[in-house]
């Protein structure tokens, strides 16, 4: 029984693809990283009582933690340049104040980068950063990022839904 060369190559590529999928899905391999899965919309989360519009335009409110990612459309996974991200978090004393609020704009490739302190837990809540994302022709999204405590950086890709 002799197999042709193209069939062997195809079978080998299938085996490699299956192995790669298994390696990529190993627990802990991407700890602290949240990727946009097939452009499924990012989950909404509570706005909370501490949101205030008019946050200062800046890319950092502290040191020790970096949150970065890309804003994409759920329609076609295209990047969303110019998306406005408003972020707010508790300061080291567990309180919310203007020093820990920021607004920034995703660049031409939809990318954003935000520096802050690692937010503390408070009142039974785990450490978290609130985000409100808005862009022309898209529904506004309110979500939260939950940092992994022993990491100082995270990738948090965001997928927003076009307006109807």
Would you name each region that the model predicts?
Residues 2-13:
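N-terminal Sec-pathway targeting helices
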